[in-house]
């Protein structure tokens, strides 16, 4: 019986080691393809060690949108600054994992002059973003990253790491190559109030604003600011524009931004009602390439220089 147990243990350990070796191999295979920030939704595939950046973006899709469709190269040119975008779209990342990405960024010897945190109200209230299990699916398996995350206070940690490992064994990951559409040209013709109402319900999980979740998110944001400032990084917070103007929870988010600006010595801007031309949007709260360029030139550039 003891011999059987020993054999089972040896087999189990050997299987785990084999899986991890394959995961490491597929990660290396994808990592060596030299991705640009505009060519992947991954952060680690574009983050290098001991690098310096002028700007680092954090947030959800409203942040990541500054890099999609080759917008990354456009705003680097407009601002004349080196940029890393660690914002995560697709409903996969909440404030806590954004904090972890920043911790890992600094732990790898990287530096940033400024962090631009796109403070979308749904990001602050969401109960689903913090427990998304697919947050790290498109991140290569790196032992320092995984080890640090194992020691990081996180919701749904085990499921997130398991999903990360499993995804490395799929054709989708192995065939992940650098790709970006050259420009985002889709545009709206007009504001559709019914669509906006449905979108607000979806963003807030068909419920009222969750103040307990907001308080948790606000605490994480303050930890993020403290971490950045401890590394000599300035922080700029802004609420992004939307064709409909203000999200549900806007005033609460705005008051938080104004409060931390006073308490933490950071900059805060409310840009929610700055872009009302439908031609600048591909949906009611995401700017297309024309919108990203216009917003960066008219509003973002003046506050970052």
Where are these predicted regions, by residue range?
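Secreted/periplasmic serine-hydrolase-like ester/acetyl group-modifying domain
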Residues: 119, 128, 132-231
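Acidic-and-aromatic substrate-binding clefts and catalytic sites of carbohydrate-active enzymes
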Residues: 64-66, 91-96, 212-217, 243-252
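C-terminal regions of proteins
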Residues: 251-304
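Membrane/wall-proximal cationic-aromatic binding patches
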Residues: 14, 18-84, 89, 95-99
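Membrane-embedded segments
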Residues: 62-149
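N-terminal Sec-pathway targeting helices
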Residues: 1-16
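Structural motif
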Residues: 54-55, 114, 236
């Amino acid at each position: 019986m003891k011999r059987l147990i020993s054999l089972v243990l040896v087999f189990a350990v050997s299987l785990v080691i084999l899986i991890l070796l394959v995961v490491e191999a597929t990660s290396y295979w994808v990592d060596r393809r030299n991705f640009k920030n505009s060519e992947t939704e991954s952060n680690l595939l574009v983050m290098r060690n001991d690098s310096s950046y002028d700007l680092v973006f954090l947030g959800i899709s409203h942040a990541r949108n500054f890099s999609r469709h080759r917008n990354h190269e456009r705003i680097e040119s407009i601002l004349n600054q080196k940029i890393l975008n660690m914002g995560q779209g697709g409903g996969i990342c909440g404030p806590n994992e954004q904090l972890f990405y920043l911790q890992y960024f600094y732990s790898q010897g990287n530096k940033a002059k400024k962090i631009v945190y796109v403070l979308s109200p749904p990001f602050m209230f969401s109960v689903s973003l913090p427990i998304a299990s697919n947050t790290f699916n498109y991140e290569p398996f790196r032992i320092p990253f995984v080890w640090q995350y194992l020691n990081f206070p996180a919701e749904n940690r085990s499921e997130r790491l398991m999903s990360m490992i499993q995804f490395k064994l799929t054709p989708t990951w192995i065939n992940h190559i650098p790709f970006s559409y050259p420009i985002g040209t889709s545009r709206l013709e007009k504001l559709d109030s019914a669509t906006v109402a449905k979108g607000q319900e979806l963003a807030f999980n068909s419920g009222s604003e969750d103040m307990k979740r907001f308080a948790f998110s606000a605490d994480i944001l303050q930890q993020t600011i403290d971490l950045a400032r401890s590394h000599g990084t300035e922080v700029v917070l802004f609420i992004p524009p939307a064709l409909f103007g203000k999200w549900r929870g806007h005033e609460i988010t705005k008051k938080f931004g104004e409060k931390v600006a006073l308490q933490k010595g950071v900059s805060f801007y409310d840009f929610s009602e700055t872009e009302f031309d439908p031609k600048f949007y591909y949906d009611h709260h995401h700017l297309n390439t024309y919108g990203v360029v216009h917003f960066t030139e008219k509003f973002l550039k003046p506050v970052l220089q």
